[in-house]
Amino acid sequence: MADASGEVAAVPASGAANGFSNGAGATPAQPNNPLSRKLHKILETRLENDKEMLEALKALSAFFVENSLRTRRNLRGDIERRSLAINEEFVNIFKDVKEELESINEDVQAMSSCCQDMTSRLQAAKEQTQDLIVKTTKLQAENQRLEIRAQVVDAFLAKFQLTSDEMSLLRGTRGGPVTEDFFKALGRVKQIHNDVKVLLRTNQQTAGLEIMEQMALLQETAYERLYRWAQSECRALTQESCDVSAVLSQAMEALQDRPVLYKYTLDEFGTARRSTVVRGFIDALTRGGPGGTPRPIEMHSHDPLRYVGDMLAWLHQATASEKEHLEALLKHVTAQGVKENIQEVVGHITEGVCRPLKVRIEQVILAEPGAVLLYKISNLLKFYHHTISGIVGNSAATLLTTIEEMHLLSKKIFFTSLSLHANKLMDKVELPPPDLGPSSALSQTLTLLRDILASHDSSVVPLDARQADFVQVLSCALDPLLQMCTVSASNLGTADMATFMVNSLYMMKTTLALFEFTDRRLEMLQFQIEAHLDTLINEQASYVLTRVGLSYIYNTIQQHRPDQGSLANMPNLDAVALKAAMAQFDRYLSAPDHLLMPQLNSLLSATVKEQIIKQSTELICRAYAEVHAAVMNPDNAYKDPENILHRSPEQVKTLLS
């Protein structure tokens, strides 16, 4: 490249000299001229495709800054000097590299020697420790086996043994508390006791039996501790507001697996609550509530019904509360008979209040506060007997028996009181009053009966029980009244007696009609009223027929026989007598109200009076029809009968309707 550049710079001078000497018409240089070939080569070169040439020219432009003849002539030398300087610099640099490489080579040689020495020593050590390696391998394998066995043992212990903390929880300390963790540990013991049965079906029966025995002992220890703790907790439940803790409920759930301990704990609870209920009942009777509200029940002893009601209401509330406490205590128990257990314990708890309750109710009943109050107390006792038995069933036998005894006693005294009242009525029977209305004894007795039945209707005793009581009450009260009225009216005339009996029976009927379960008695009273009404109807008809002179005529016609001859020839049945009777009968037809018996005005019921008038009028019309038929009969030999009886039966019926 330097040579070519030098020659290129020298070419123009030579060429120019040759050109001037040869002139314009000179022939071109020969192709075999070396210079020509170089020129052609240079001229034909395509610099854009020659990257090396471009790089050389770029390097040349870095130091060839002045294009002159001198610089062109010295270009070759400059290039060579520059090339030499570069080579010297390169040599100096590589000398440093060579020295570094020689140092590295020495280090590598030293390291190689060290490695060879270490390899030799390792080989020697390997040969010397071969036995140790074999032993180590065996020990590692043994260690692995032991680790596996340790894991198995740990798993076995975790499965079939308790931790020290769990053991401490189960054994605990005397009087120490029982917590949730205790029941978890107890559940763990039960689980182990059940799981260990698997070992008994394998070749590990000895271990299984030992573990089972150990768990059984732990269970007994835990149950004994739990029982002592639960017993202590139950003894502490002596407040009126009993708060059963969740832990105590869990304790009862756990103790159900030991029926004897479970029963003893329930008995302890019942004993504690029994004394609390008795104390609370006595306090309610004598001291009242906190701060004097509510007031002591004994302060209402002057009001027998409220006194008995307050005592029974307190007991009802206490019974319901104790049942709720027991339900909270046994809410987690799943064994059979929980309901029966609750009822039995409630019966034991409430048994303590029976004696003070019985004494106080007996005092009230035996004081004989009156038939109405006795009956109300009897119904009240029956209601609470039904209500409390609905809460606790029939297991609270003592309390329910006490209430039932008091109910029967009050009922007995009540009916005794009614019987005494009835005996007094019969011992001194009053004469009917002048107006033939109900006697004062009857009115007083019916007022008493109305009060009794009203209290019975308002009671909350079950329907079937109320109906049975009603029948007995009505029999005890009404039968003596009916007998008294009959005896009282026995010396009266027929119409007076019938009027008095109708009034008395009507008053009884209106009294009973207001109440339920009286339909049968109302029917009986109605039958008796109708019997006496028939008497009054006949008496009223007879009264009218007698007053108008038709009574004798009608009776004679009814008793007449054909062999006696014609009616016209019989005494007092001739045409003159009949016309006189018809004249009076016409006056009756014009004002029938003027011929009413005085007794009818004494009747209490206007409806009954109208019924008597209506039906007696029908009898009169029927009697007139028979008289009319007999007179119109030709066999009776009446002449011109139309002039004797100028009204037909239909006309008479129309006038009287």
Swiss-Prot record:
UniProt membrane topology term: Peripheral membrane protein
One GO CC term, this protein: Golgi membrane
Compartmental location: Golgi apparatus membrane
Keywords of the record: Golgi apparatus, Membrane, Protein transport, Transport
SMART domains in alphabetical order: COG6 (SM01087)
Domain of life, source organism: Eukaryota
GO terms, biological process: glycosylation; intra-Golgi vesicle-mediated transport; protein transport
Function: Required for normal Golgi function.
Protein family per UniProt: Belongs to the COG6 family.
Oligomer status and interactors: Component of the conserved oligomeric Golgi complex which is composed of eight different subunits and is required for normal Golgi morphology and localization.
Protein name as it appears in the record: Conserved oligomeric Golgi complex subunit 6
Gene: Cog6
